[in-house]
């Protein structure tokens, strides 16, 4: 009786060893990845069966949370759907997707910055723009005409240039043509003027050959010559602003001054 029991135990041990040897030689699925038993969100470690049949725990870098992948996939799918709707023109304006709002907002900001850059330089051309609705426009026209008649005045003085120089003559200080203030003002005018206005003020033959820097330098020299003529003319004839008490008016007595520029008619 006891011998039969030992014989049965030996048979069971032999069978288990044979099954283990067969399982180790089975390489039909050497790269099968399985996850140990455990629910979602648990700390169960995934395991991998390698060629040698031994199970090894995955490293921390190999662990991937399913909920993170799911969220990224959903966001990508939503953005793709919005983009496709925009391309096909099927988006209702009352429910504009977030992607469309981001895409439309950037060009608008860029366009405003570009327009500001383009208009800033033009707005700085002259300190005072001459307009037809200016109440002193008729006076400026007559003053401009008289400036053109100044002896040896360079040709082509514009109305805007005449008004700028007329204002410079009546500065409370720094109106001398060779002074730093007047020189900087004329240099600013030459550098900020539209190139088409610069070309009109210069000889066409020179304009055809010169670079932009050469054109603006030549225009600056011409402005200096014109202002020197205007300065001498106004200090000899008293062409000053009626509403200001300038140094010129303090030097010249009104009774002894013969006004060649009838700007202040009553």
UniProtKB/Swiss-Prot annotation:
Q: What is its main location?
A: secreted
Sequence motif RxLR-dEER, location on chain: 48-63
* Keywords noted in UniProt: Host nucleus, Secreted, Signal, Virulence
State the compartments where it is located.
Secreted; Host nucleus
* Signal peptide as annotated in the record: 1-18
Gene Ontology CC, one term: host cell nucleus
Query: What family does this chain come from, according to its entry?
Result: Belongs to the RxLR effector family.
The domain section of the record reads: The RxLR-dEER motif acts to carry the protein into the host cell cytoplasm through binding to cell surface phosphatidylinositol-3-phosphate.
Q: What does this protein do?
A: Secreted effector that dos not suppress the host cell death induced by cell death-inducing proteins.
Give the protein's recorded name. Answer: Secreted RxLR effector protein 128
- What organism is recorded for this protein? Plasmopara viticola
């Amino acid at each position: 009786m006891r011998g039969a029991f030992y014989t049965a135990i030996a048979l069971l041990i032999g069978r288990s060893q044979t099954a283990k040897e067969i399982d180790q030689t089975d390489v039909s699925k050497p790269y099968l990845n399985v996850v140990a038993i455990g629910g979602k969100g648990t700390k169960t470690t995934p395991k991998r069966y390698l060629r040698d049949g031994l199970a090894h725990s995955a490293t921390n870098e190999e662990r991937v949370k399913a909920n993170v992948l799911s969220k990224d996939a959903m966001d990508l799918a939503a953005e793709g759907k919005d983009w496709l709707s925009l391309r096909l023109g099927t988006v209702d304006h009352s429910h504009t997707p977030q992607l469309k709002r981001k895409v439309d907002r950037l060009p608008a900001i860029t366009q405003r910055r570009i327009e500001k850059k383009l208009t800033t330089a033009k707005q700085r051309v002259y300190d005072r723009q001459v307009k037809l609705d200016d109440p002193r426009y008729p006076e400026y026209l007559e003053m401009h005409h008289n400036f053109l008649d100044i002896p040896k005045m360079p040709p082509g003085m514009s109305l805007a240039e005449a008004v700028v120089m007329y204002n410079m003559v009546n500065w409370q200080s720094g109106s001398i043509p060779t002074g730093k203030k007047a020189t900087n003002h004329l240099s600013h005018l030459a550098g900020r003027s539209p190139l088409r206005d610069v070309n009109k003020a210069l000889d066409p033959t020179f304009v055809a050959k010169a670079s932009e820097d050469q054109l603006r330098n030549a225009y600056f020299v011409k402005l200096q010559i014109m202002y020197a003529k205007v300065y001498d003319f106004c200090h000899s004839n008293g062409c000053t602003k009626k509403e200001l008490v300038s140094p010129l008016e303090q030097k010249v007595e009104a009774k002894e001054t013969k006004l060649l520029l009838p700007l202040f008619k009553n």
